[in-house]
Amino acid sequence: MDPTSLGLVVKPPKARVVRRRIITICIYAASWLLLVLLSPLWIPLGILIGLARRRSFVLLRLLLFGCFYLGFELMALVLIAGVFLLYRADARASALYRLQAWWATINLKVAQRLLGLEIVVEGAENAVPGPSILLIRHASILDTLLPCVFVQRPYGLRVRYVLKQELLFDPCIDLVGNALPNYFVDRTGDTPKELEGLRALVSNIGTDSVLIFPEGTRFSDEKRRRALEKLKSQGSPLCDSAHALTRVLPPKPGGVLTLLDALPGIDCVFFAHTGLESFAKIKDLLSGEVVGSKVRIRLWRVSSQEIPAE
């Protein structure tokens, strides 16, 4: 779950790693306990609001998912601790990859069941073999789950993620994400330093793939408008082509170009999806439009020979 979906910019606590993890785990545990204790109140209230507003009981569905998600997070933390205690070196990495894919799959399946989602996937086999650069559309708070569920778990592909640091607020993402080769970008930090971090991430990529969100942030019509205005004010030669992109933001080239430069001769795999737009923020979810949505996912591969050298 992405805490920025609440409409707030939630930064990881400014403290040492151990202290940060204690804080976030305590927040998750307290939130889950509070939801459980108050369930005799919010369950009937959610039913009454659903009957009154006629929005497919979306508030009740979201509260049920939130209660599950927080409780499942705590259970997963116990399993993560077990992996760290029982496994060593390569065996630990393999176990964490399996646990990561399982965690994502369970979360997505529960969301799918509670919200009545229909998910159709086409071309997932194009993600293998690695190595490759996975370029995924960013439109919802569930986007980080999709590659784990539809690429990593069924095909055994190890994926290295480029994610924003705000996701470290999630204890499972923090612990597993930092134990495996991934990079958490400080979007307010030193850009050259962040790009150097991407180069280090893929310096020994082997048969793994690396995933990045070229847009840099979740899509919205307002963000697209601002991005186009910025390109126009800068007199960018990309302005016309950016206007043709109606359902994605103009890509931020720095990260992708850095990966292409660091990984010459490697294919790119595009991971497109539609139907999750109502998952962008909590206020979008509360509209009820998400219930019964059809989610379409399509992957296609572009050979390195088709990618311009300049």
Which residues make up each language-model segment?
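Cytosolic, positively charged, low-complexity intrinsically disordered regions immediately flanking transmembrane
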Residues: 182-187, 194-195, 223-227
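A Trp-anchored, charged/polar loop motif used as the substrate-binding/catalytic surface
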Residues: 191-203
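A cross-family acyltransferase "interaction/gating" segment
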Residues: 153, 165-180, 204-309
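Catalytic core of membrane glycerolipid acyltransferases/transacylases, capturing the structured
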Residues: 80-103, 113, 132-190
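Membrane-anchoring hydrophobic helices of lipid-metabolizing enzymes
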Residues: 2-132, 146
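A structural micro-motif
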Residues: 117, 157-159, 266
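Short, glycine/acidic-rich beta->alpha junctions
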Residues: 25, 142-143, 193-194, 250-254
